[in-house]
C-alpha cells in the first residue's frame, strides 16, 4: 500500500477541507462507494471463496469513524454515496450510520444515499431505509431458479431475497436488479429475468465478471462479453441506446417490448474509465482510487492521528492526485491469476 507521507504539522489551512477533488485527468470525484464490512451471509462463487477468512473485527473502523470519513468526502464535493460490502445490512448497528448520512441529504450537502445489497435483510430494514432518506437501492440477483440461486450463492435462499424485494417496493424504494452475466450458467435466463424485473417496474443491469480475488472457480469458464449478450437479446427485443445515466458506469438501453431499461456494465469489453467519477473506501479506512489497481491510501492513520480535518483533507487530496487513468483487467487462459488480489467483498464493487 502506498501511504501518503505527509507531515501532519504541515497540514494546509481549513480551506482544504472544502476544496473539490479533481484527479490528474480532469475528472471530478463526486461519488464515494463505502464498503462497511467485508462479511456477507452469501458466498457467491464469482465474489469470494466458500471458506473465506474475514478481517478481524478489531481492524474495522467504527461506525463513527466511517461517518467522519464520509463527512470529509461530502465536504470536498461528493454528492452521491453508496454503501456496499460484503453485505452492508449485516453490519451491526448499520442503521446508525445510514441515519447520520441521511441528515446530509436533509441539509442539502448530499444528493443521494444508496446501497447495494443481496436482499437477504431487506424485509427487516426496507421501511427504516426509506425513513433515513434512502430512495433507491441495487439488489444483486443472478437467477430466479432456486437451485441455481443456491448453487451460485452457496448459502442463499431465493425466497428470502424475493420477499425482501417485495418489502422494498412496498416501502417505496426504487429497486434496480444487478445480475452478473455468466456463460453456461444464467445467460439463457437473462431474457426472462429482464421481463420479470421490468414487469415489476425495476431496471435490470447486467455486469461482466471481473478478475478480482482468488475464488474457487476459473473465471474464464463463465466469462461472457456483454457485447455478445446484447446480440442475443436483439434477436427478440428492440434495444434503443439512451442518454440516461445514474452517476455510475452503466450504459442504458430502452427495451421497447417491455417498456423497461436495461443497463450494461462492461469493465472488460468497453471500460468506463474515461468518465470515472468515483473512489472506494474500505471498512478498514483504505482508499482505492481505482477498482482495478492496487495503489491505495491509508486514511485510518490520518483519521486517528488528529481531530484536525484539514490534515485528513490533505491526505485525501494526495490520494486523488494519484488516481490512474484506468484499469488493466484481462480475463483469458494466459492470465488466470486475478488482476487484483483483493476480493470484491473487500473493495465493495
From Swiss-Prot:
One GO BP annotation is: Mo-molybdopterin cofactor biosynthetic process
Q: Which SUPFAM superfamilies match?
A: Radical SAM enzymes
**InterPro entries assigned:** Aldolase_TIM (IPR013785), Elp3/MiaA/NifB-like_rSAM (IPR006638), MoaA (IPR013483), MoaA_NifB_PqqE_Fe-S-bd_CS (IPR000385), MoaA_twitch (IPR010505), MoCo_biosynth_MoaA/MoaC (IPR050105), rSAM (IPR007197)
What is its EC class?
lyase
- The residues covered by the Radical SAM core domain are 24-249
Which reaction(s) does its UniProt entry say it catalyses?
GTP + AH2 + S-adenosyl-L-methionine = (8S)-3',8-cyclo-7,8-dihydroguanosine 5'-triphosphate + 5'-deoxyadenosine + L-methionine + A + H(+)
User: S-adenosyl-L-methionine: present as a keyword of the record?
Assistant: yes
EC number(s) per UniProt?
4.1.99.22
Superkingdom of this protein's organism: Bacteria
The keyword Nucleotide-binding belongs to this UniProt entry's keyword annotation: yes
Biological role: Catalyzes the cyclization of GTP to (8S)-3',8-cyclo-7,8-dihydroguanosine 5'-triphosphate.
The similarity comment for this entry is: Belongs to the radical SAM superfamily. MoaA family.
**Under which name does UniProt file this protein?**
GTP 3',8-cyclase
Query: Gene name on record?
Result: moaA
Amino acid at each position: 500500500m502506498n501511504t501518503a507521507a505527509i507531515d501532519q504539522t504541515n497540514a494546509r489551512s481549513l480551506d482544504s477541507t472544502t476544496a473539490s477533488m479533481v484527479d490528474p485527468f480532469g475528472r471530478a470525484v463526486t461519488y464515494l462507494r463505502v464498503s462497511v464490512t467485508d462479511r456477507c451471509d452469501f458466498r457467491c462463487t464469482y465474489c469470494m471463496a466458500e471458506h473465506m477468512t474475514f478481517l478481524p473485527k478489531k481492524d474495522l473502523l467504527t461506525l463513527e469513524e466511517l461517518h467522519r470519513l464520509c463527512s470529509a468526502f461530502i465536504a470536498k464535493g461528493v454528492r452521491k454515496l453508496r454503501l456496499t460490502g460484503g453485505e452492508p445490512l449485516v453490519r451491526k448497528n448499520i442503521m446508525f450510520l445510514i441515519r447520520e448520512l441521511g441528515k446530509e441529504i436533509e441539509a442539502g450537502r448530499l444528493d443521494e444515499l444508496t446501497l447495494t445489497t443481496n436482499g437477504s435483510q431487506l424485509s427487516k430494514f426496507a421501511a427504516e431505509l426509506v425513513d433515513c432518506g434512502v430512495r433507491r437501492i441495487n439488489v444483486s440477483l443472478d437467477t430466479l431458479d432456486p437451485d441455481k440461486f443456491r448453487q451460485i450463492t452457496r448459502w442463499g435462499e431465493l425466497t428470502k431475497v424475493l420477499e425482501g424485494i417485495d418489502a422494498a417496493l412496498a416501502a417505496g424504494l426504487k429497486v434496480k436488479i444487478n445480475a452478473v452475466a455468466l456463460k453456461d450458467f444464467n445467460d439463457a435466463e437473462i431474457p426472462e429475468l429482464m421481463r420479470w424485473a421490468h414487469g415489476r417496474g425495476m431496471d435490470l443491469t447486467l455486469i461482466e465478471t471481473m478478475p478480482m480475488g482468488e475464488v474457487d472457480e476459473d473465471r474464464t469458464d463463465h466469462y461472457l462479453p456483454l457485447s455478445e449478450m446484447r446480440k442475443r437479446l436483439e434477436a427478440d427485443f428492440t434495444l434503443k441506446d439512451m442518454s440516461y445515466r445514474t452517476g455510475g458506469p452503466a450504459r442504458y438501453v430502452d427495451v421497447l417490448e417491455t417498456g423497461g431499461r436495461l443497463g450494461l456494465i462492461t469493465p472488460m469489453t468497453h471500460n468506463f474509465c474515461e468518465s470515472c467519477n468515483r473512489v472506494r473506501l474500505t471498512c478498514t479506512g483504505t482508499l482505492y482510487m481505482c477498482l482495478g489497481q492496487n495503489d491505495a491510501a491509508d486514511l485510518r492513520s490520518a483519521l486517528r492521528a488528529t481531530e484536525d480535518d484539514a490534515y485528513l483533507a490533505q491526505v485525501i487530496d494526495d490520494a486523488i492526485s494519484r488516481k490512474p487513468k484506468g484499469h488493466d483487467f484481462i480475463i483469458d487462459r494466459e492470465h488466470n491469476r486475478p488482476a487484483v488480489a483483493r476480493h470484491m467483498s473487500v473493495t465493495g464493487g
